[in-house]
């Protein structure tokens, strides 16, 4: 008697390029490139030159993606133990360590070369310093060494507006440093909100995030204080004449919203609120820099 025919569905296998793309943290890099673009646009009163604009965004984006890939490499052990990151390419074995290292290094070299030859050496070296700051100083050392890891290491993540500025002008300017200060003040409350939500996971892998070492309530207080500092930092562009009334009104509303969310977290906490604060902080930074961009062209 003939055997009944069975039909089996093919098992979908992830495409290799998706694993490489995931290692570059594309959503994080996209937000970072927005701040680069704003730095570029604010550096000049009129239209931004096309060559440094495109080459700068591509080169900085490549080196940022390389830094993210190095982060995946260095954190692969603890990533495999945390619910948020266990499905990343390296813990799951979708990419070998050798291939990941080759990919990250190739991206870094190509990005640096593009910035050096098509933009300017200053931007290339500053971007390289940011890569070292994030991938080596923060990820390999500070993250595991001190609960102030994100405060000290946050400087590397705050550099993109300065990189955009130097890509267009080839020089430092105080206005660009004000944008760096804004992101520097934004970084701790952004990451500490996530750390509260993932406190048990960080404790499990012995990463001394502030909620692990000093407790959740202390961290909530620090988040509130930093949102106030951030609100003050957001006023700097107005005080020095960089921005006009549109940015002033918009940034004030965003600052009040962030302070209110931090107040809720401290005094009216409920399940899931820490992640709400984390997500709000992302929209806060994105909208703030869009305000800077729109106000620049309206005000100038």
UniProtKB/Swiss-Prot annotation:
Keywords: Cell inner membrane, Cell membrane, Heme biosynthesis, Membrane, Transferase, Transmembrane, Transmembrane helix. The keyword GTP-binding does not apply. One of its GO terms (cellular component) is plasma membrane. The keyword Transmembrane helix applies. GO terms for biological process: heme O biosynthetic process. It is a multi-pass membrane protein. Its main location: membrane. One of its GO terms (molecular function) is protoheme IX farnesyltransferase activity. Its EC number is 2.5.1.141. The chain crosses the membrane at residues 28-48, 50-70, 106-126, 150-170, 176-196, 222-242, 243-263, 280-300. Carbon 2 of the heme B porphyrin ring is defined according to the Fischer nomenclature. This is Protoheme IX farnesyltransferase 1. Pathway: Porphyrin-containing compound metabolism; heme O biosynthesis; heme O from protoheme: step 1/1. It is found in: Cell inner membrane. It catalyses: heme b + (2E,6E)-farnesyl diphosphate + H2O = Fe(II)-heme o + diphosphate. The gene is cyoE1. NCBIfam families: cyoE_ctaB, PRK04375.1-2. The lineage of its organism: Bacteria, Pseudomonadati, Pseudomonadota, Gammaproteobacteria, Alteromonadales. Converts heme B (protoheme IX) to heme O by substitution of the vinyl group on carbon 2 of heme B porphyrin ring with a hydroxyethyl farnesyl side group. It comes from the Bacteria. Belongs to the UbiA prenyltransferase family. Protoheme IX farnesyltransferase subfamily.
């Amino acid at each position: 008697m003939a055997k009944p025919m069975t039909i089996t569905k093919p098992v979908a296998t992830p495409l290799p390029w998706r694993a490489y793309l995931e290692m570059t943290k594309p959503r994080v890099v996209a937000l970072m490139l927005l701040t680069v673009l704003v730095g570029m646009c604010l550096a000049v009163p009129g239209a931004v030159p096309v060559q440094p604009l495109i080459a700068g965004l591509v080169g900085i984006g490549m080196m940022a993606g390389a830094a993210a890939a190095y982060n995946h490499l260095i954190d692969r052990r603890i990533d495999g133990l945390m619910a948020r990151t266990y499905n990343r390419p390296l813990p799951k074995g979708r990419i070998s360590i050798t291939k990941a290292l080759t990919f990250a290094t190739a991206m870094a070299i190509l990005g640096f070369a593009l910035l050096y030859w098509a933009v300017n050496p200053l931007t290339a070296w500053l971007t390289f310093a940011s890569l070292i700051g994030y991938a080596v100083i923060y990820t390999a050392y500070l993250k595991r060494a001190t609960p102030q890891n994100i405060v000290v290491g946050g400087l590397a993540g705050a550099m993109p507006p300065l990189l955009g500025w130097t890509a267009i002008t080839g020089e430092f300017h105080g206005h660009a440093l004000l944008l760096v200060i804004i992101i520097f003040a934004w970084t701790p409350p952004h990451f500490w909100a996530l750390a509260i939500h993932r406190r048990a996971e960080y404790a499990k892998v012995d990463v001394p995030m502030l909620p692990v070492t000093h407790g959740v309530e202390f961290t909530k207080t620090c988040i509130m204080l930093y949102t106030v500092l951030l609100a003050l930092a957001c006023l700097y562009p107005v005080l020095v004449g960089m921005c006009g009334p549109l940015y002033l009104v918009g940034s004030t509303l965003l600052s009040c919203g962030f302070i209110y969310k931090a107040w809720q977290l401290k005094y009216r906490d409920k399940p899931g609120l820490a992640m709400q604060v984390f997500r709000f902080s992302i929209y806060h930074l994105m909208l703030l820099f869009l305000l800077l961009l729109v106000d620049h062209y309206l005000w100038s």
